[in-house]
Amino acid sequence: MPTRVNDGVDADEVTFVNRFTVHGGPAEFESVFARTAAFFARQPGFVRHTLLRERDKDNSYVNIAVWTDHDAFRRALAQPGFLPHATALRALSTSEHGLFTARQTLPEGGDTTGSGHR
């Protein structure tokens, strides 16, 4: 199936990917994460996020968060209100993370003409 090479559409957009290994209960982690997500959702430049849990491992999660640009993401992390959220997540989990930019996209339905591509 064809993919679309990044053609400058949303070229500034960045995706933060964070993989968590949870040491406490999944329900507690998800509750703390929901509060963290609500904090980020109020920040300028936040686009969306998805928290995924691995099917066969209750303690393995991945968060995928999209931001309009790197500066917006950086400003959100610098907000004084972020530290309590980071501390709460670190108390329940360890994580690995990275900031990514799109290189190829396959829009829903496999449309490579550009309609439906975001």
Swiss-Prot record:
Record domain ABM: where: 14-100
Gene3D superfamilies named in the record: 3.30.70.100
Resulting phenotype, residue 67 to F: Loss of monooxygenase activity
Site entry: Important for catalytic activity: 18, 63, 67
InterPro entries named in the record: ABM_dom, Dimeric_a/b-barrel
One GO term (biological process): antibiotic biosynthetic process
Effect on the protein upon substituting residue 40 to M: Oxygenase activity comparable to the wild-type
Cross-referenced PROSITE patterns: ABM (PS51725)
Catalyzed reaction equations: deoxynogalonate + O2 = nogalonate + H2O + H(+)
Pathway: Antibiotic biosynthesis
Key words, A-Z: Antibiotic biosynthesis, Oxidoreductase
GO molecular function: oxidoreductase activity, acting on single donors with incorporation of molecular oxygen, incorporation of one atom of oxygen (internal monooxygenases or internal mixed function oxidases)
SUPFAM superfamilies: Dimeric alpha+beta barrel
Entry EC no(s): 1.13.12.22
Role this protein plays: Involved in the biosynthesis of the anthracycline (aromatic polyketide) antibiotic nogalamycin. Catalyzes the oxygenation of 12-deoxy-nogalonic acid at position 12 to yield nogalonic acid.
Subunit structure: Homodimer.
The protein's name: Deoxynogalonate monooxygenase
